[in-house]
Regions:
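Pyridoxal 5′-phosphate
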Residues: 1-372
Length: 372
């Protein structure tokens, strides 16, 4: 066990280094061989990675593919939808969504003719409430971008409630599951689009993102970002006979990257082999310890939801100042506790390598550094 509280950044698990090394050594051997086995083997590895994700979130076969990151996934979706679906309508996002996605949508408004509406955080609060998000959501909303778990507060959206409202409004629901998948149970259910990363609680590599598109929506998507791998047969090179694959492969484009998927497979195997419920229980025990101790610390303010069922796997705490937050992170690092901060917000995410003893010691250190 260790003082590692950075699962919101990069996830890890016991034995990760050796297992990833084994996977990458195998890749190196195959990729460097002087024969023609490379691509068949590597594309099979990529397909295995995709199936692992499908199994993890209950997605039907053929509804997922790889992307480099969630920003590219969302861009591919926007460029795939019929013009009349977006033009003159709204895309709804919360003020606590992942900034990269907001940056993207802001830049695409003029070209695609939609208006980006950002639902604000209430005065004096830290995250956008589900009821406020739903309150801003009418039948003129083409896409609702839902952050399942916030990266700044760990607030977890009620996806059942949101999905029900989305169906009533005829809206495409896009769920960003990056900060929650692998540490809380998640199923695609009736959600239209899911984007996510393997980097956090799935203990994988950067570059191993995914996109899921509901089967009924797939048939109307024609991604403008397309290429030879968008086709049923990538080796169909007749310029005049391009056709999209009838499954999620239509969201592929050029030659796919495989290395990130290979480096991430051990983490996916660990999560599926251990069980998300088991990992969630351990995490909930540790995060509840932090929440309880922060509540008794008069110098720190909890910005995550108080109730465990409303949180993801992290606990976010507000320091008195930006300078204090940075100083706390530095001091904790010197004491072998690893966390980070965003402005005044300290972020703590315990996982499978984090023990109760280390969590209690972290809380003791926070008390010492803030209230003496």
């Amino acid at each position: 066990m260790s003082g590692y509280f950075l699962y919101h950044s990069i996830g890890t698990y016991p034995g990760k280094a050796e297992q990833v090394k084994t996977a990458l050594d195998r890749y190196s051997d195959i990729w460097s061989a002087e024969n023609d086995s490379q691509w068949p083997a590597m594309l099979a590895e990529r397909a295995h990675f995709i199936r692992s994700w499908e199994n993890l979130i209950g997605a039907p076969a053929g509804t997922m593919t790889t992307v480099e990151n969630v920003t590219l996934a969302l861009y591919s979706l926007i460029g795939a939808l019929p013009d009349e679906l977006l033009r003159g309508r709204r895309i709804l996002a919360a003020a606590d969504c992942f900034p990269s996605l907001h940056f993207l949508l802001t830049g695409l408004q003029a070209r695609f003719g939609f208006t980006l509406e950002t639902v604000p955080v209430r005065q004096g609060e830290s995250f956008v409430r589900d009821e406020d998000f739903i309150g801003a959501w009418g039948n003129d909303v083409a896409i609702a971008l839902v952050t399942w778990v916030s990266s700044t507060t760990s607030k977890r959206a009620d996806m059942d409630l949101i999905s029900k409202h989305g169906r009533q409004q005829g809206t495409i629901i896009v769920a960003d599951v990056t900060q929650g998948v692998g540490i809380r149970p998640f199923s695609v259910g009736e959600i239209d689009v899911v984007v996510g990363s393997s980097l956090k609680w799935l203990c994988g590599s950067s570059g191993a993102g995914v996109i899921y598109v509901r089967p009924g929506l797939l048939t109307v998507c024609e991604p403008e970002l397309r290429g030879w791998f968008s086709q049923p047969d990538p080796f169909s090179w007749d310029f005049d006979t391009f056709a999209y694959a009838d499954d999620a492969r239509r969201f592929d484009h050029g030659t796919p990257a495989v290395l990130a998927a290979i480096a991430s497979q051990p983490g996916l195997d660990f999560v599926s082999g251990t069980g998300v419920d088991v990992l969630a229980l351990h995490n909930e025990q540790l995060t509840s310890m932090i929440v309880e101790r922060v509540a008794a610390n008069t110098a720190l303010t909890l910005v995550s939801p108080q109730k465990s069922q409303e949180r993801g796997g992290s606990v976010m705490v507000q320091a008195v100042s930006v300078e204090q937050a940075a100083a706390i992170v530095t001091t904790l690092k010197n004491e072998n506790f690893y966390c980070d901060c965003r402005s005044r917000i300290l972020r703590f995410s315990p996982g499978s390598v984090t023990s109760e003893e280390e969590t209690a010691a972290l809380c003791d250190a926070l008390d010492r550094l803030t209230i003496g």
